Amino acid sequence: MGRAFEYRKARKMKRWGNMARVFTKLGKEITIAAKEGGPDVETNPRLRILVQTAKKENMPKENVERAIKKATSKDYTDYKEMNYEGYGPYGIAIFVETATDNTTRTVANVRSYFNKHGGSLGTSGSLEFLFQHKCVFHIVKKDDMDLESLELELIDYGVDELEEDENEIILYGDFSENSNIQKYLEDAGYEIASAEFVRIPNDTKEVTAEQREQIEKLIERIEEDEDVQNVFHNMKEEEGEE
């Protein structure tokens, strides 16, 4: 489950081409978290993890500080987090997460992307059941780590899958367990390199190379929109990427 998500994420980062898009997305998340839970990372767990994620992505410290200050400034932009769901070409389910200061503009734009690329925007919540909403934690791997023991240790706190990467361990849990997992990892002294929320499809749909090209054009167009934070889909990855 998780490995395919990591491949999708890597391809998305490659499509974005430069870090400016990543910084914009993270900046919005940081501002929203600081507005909701306060600007102090010591008392705001969500902000704390986002700042750590920004560090991993090499986001400049001044960008992070500016995003936090934006939450308490008189010029604060009131972002609303809205989800849009629809079907792309060939029945591929697409779930779009946005953070916008103008929902009328955003929904009109997203609908136009679907329409122009052979898809259709559905009603809110209509496709949510096709995806598992997960929290993902990347923790720094230590030489003496026993993965089997670690998995048994973490299962009581909501972790339901664990994967080993080159320099880190990737943990997956249900979205609702995010706070429990983060608190335990921090209290137990694990170093969290980054964390994020994802939607992983329950099942994936096979497509031809030509169909894939058409679907990816729609996904790329949606991702280019500045209001869009994440795009998830249930198209099966190409051979060798599962």
From Swiss-Prot:
Entry's localization field: Cytoplasm
GO molecular function annotation: DNA binding
Pfam families: TACO1_YebC_N, Transcrip_reg
GO biological process: regulation of DNA-templated transcription
Keyword Ribonucleoprotein found: no
Keyword Cytoplasm among UniProt keywords: yes
GO cellular component: cytosol
Record-linked SUPFAM superfamilies: YebC-like
Keyword annotations from UniProtKB, A to Z: Cytoplasm, DNA-binding, Transcription, Transcription regulation
Coiled-coil regions listed: none
NCBIfam families (UniProt xref): PRK00110.1, PRK12378.1, YebC/PmpR family DNA-binding transcriptional regulator
Assigned protein family: Belongs to the TACO1 family.
The protein, known as: Probable transcriptional regulatory protein PG_0097
